[in-house]
Amino acid sequence: MPAAVSISQEILKPHLEIQGGHTLSRELKVSGAKNSALVLMTSALLSEGPLELHNVPQLTDIQGMADILASLGVRVKRSQETVWLQADGLHHAEPPYDLVNGLRASFFCIGPLLGRLGHAKVPLPGGCRIGARPVVEHIRGLKALGAMVKVEHGVVTASVPGTSRRLKGAAIVLDCPSVGATETILMAAVLAEGTSTIENAAQEPEVQDLAKMLNAMGARVSGAGGPIITIEGVERLHGCNYSVIPDRIEAGTFLIAAAITRSIVRVSPVIPEHLNAVLQKLRDCGCTLEIDKQGITLIPGDLHGVDIITQPFPGFPTDLQAPFMALLTTAKGTSVVTEKIYENRMQHVAELQRMGASIRLQGNTAVVEGIPQLSAAPVSGNDLRAAAALVLAGLAAHGISQVDGLNHLDRGYDEIETKLNASGAHILRHQPSG
C-alpha cells in the first residue's frame, strides 16, 4: 500500500500548516511598527548625519526599503532590530523600478529627495492590491510647496525650479486625511523655506512618530496627532538615535488571536491609546481587558457579534478589519462589517467561507452570522491583513488548515508563527524547495 500523502504535501506554495483548537497562554511580544519604521527610514534622506533606528521589525518590507535607500547612495547596516543609515553620499534621485514595484512605501522617498536634492524621479509604487490608493494628494501637496510635478508612463518626476532648489512653505488642505500624503508633505516641508501647514492631516500614531523623530533631527514640527500640523522650515537636519513605536496592528492581531481561541493572553509592549477603538469593540464582544503601562491582558468571555465601521484614526483601523471579521465568524449573533477606507478589502471573505463562515457580502459591507466553530481548509491570503485573518481563523478551526500567501504575511508580521507557537499554537511553516 502506498504511503499516505499529507495535505501539506499537496500544496506546492510556501504555506503555514495550522492545527486548530489549541488555547494560547503566556505573553505575546509586539515588534516595532512596520508602517512607522518604513517612513522613518526614508527620513534618513533628509540629512547627512547618521540615523540609528531601534525596535525595527525584521520584515521583507524593511529589507525592501533598505535596498531602495542603498540604491540611492545611502549607507545601510542592519543588526537584528537596529538599522543604521547615513545619506552623506546621496548621489541618485531615481530608485529603480524593480525595487519599488513591490513596496508601496517606496513612494515616501519623493518628499525627502525633493527637500534635500531639489529633484526626484520615483516610479508609482506597488504593495498589496487592496484598492486604488492614489498619490494625487501627495502630488498636490508637493506642487503647493513649489515643486513642478508630472506623471508620465507610471513615473512621477518632480523638481524645484530656480537656483536655490529649495521648496517654499505653503498652506495645504487635504481633501481626505491621507496618512501617506500627510507624511510625504511633512518630510518635504521640513527643509522648505518658510512655514507650512497641513489641514485635515492624518492623525495616526505613525504620523506622530514621524514628527517626533524629525524634531529629534532638528525639525520644527508641531500639532502632529491633531487635524492641523505646522512645520517651520529649517536649513538642515542632523542625525539621531530613535526607537520605533510598538506596532498597534500586530498588537491588535494578537489580542484578536487570544479572543478567537478563547485564551487568556498578555500582549506587550502596547500603547493602549493607539488601540482605543479596537479595545472598545473587544469589550463590546464580551472580552475583559486588563491594561497597564506596558501591556494588555485579554480575558475572553461569551463572545457575541458587534458592528464594525473602518475609519481613519482614532476610528477602527482598516488594517484590523479582516482579523476582526475572523473573530466575528464564531461570535454569537449577527455582525455587520463595513469597509470605508479601501474599495477592494474584502478578499478574505471568500476564504473564510471556505472554512464554513456564514458571511453575506454586499459591496463593501459584510453581514456575518456567527457559527460555533470554523472547519479547517486550504486557503489563500491575497493581501497582508487577509493572510493574518486566515491564520487567526486557522487557530480556531477544527482540524488542520493550510494558509498560503506568505509573501504578503511576511511583509507585515515579524515571525508570526514563532511568536504564536511560543504561546501554545501549533503552526508549521512549509517552504518547498525548487
Swiss-Prot record:
Cell wall biogenesis/degradation recorded as keyword: yes
UniProt keyword annotations, A-Z: Cell cycle, Cell division, Cell shape, Cell wall biogenesis/degradation, Cytoplasm, Peptidoglycan synthesis, Pyruvate, Transferase
Organism of derivation: Prochlorococcus marinus (strain MIT 9313)
Database matches in CDD domains: UdpNAET
Reactions catalysed according to its record: phosphoenolpyruvate + UDP-N-acetyl-alpha-D-glucosamine = UDP-N-acetyl-3-O-(1-carboxyvinyl)-alpha-D-glucosamine + phosphate
Any one GO cellular component localisation term in the record: cytoplasm
Signal peptide: none
UniProt protein name: UDP-N-acetylglucosamine 1-carboxyvinyltransferase
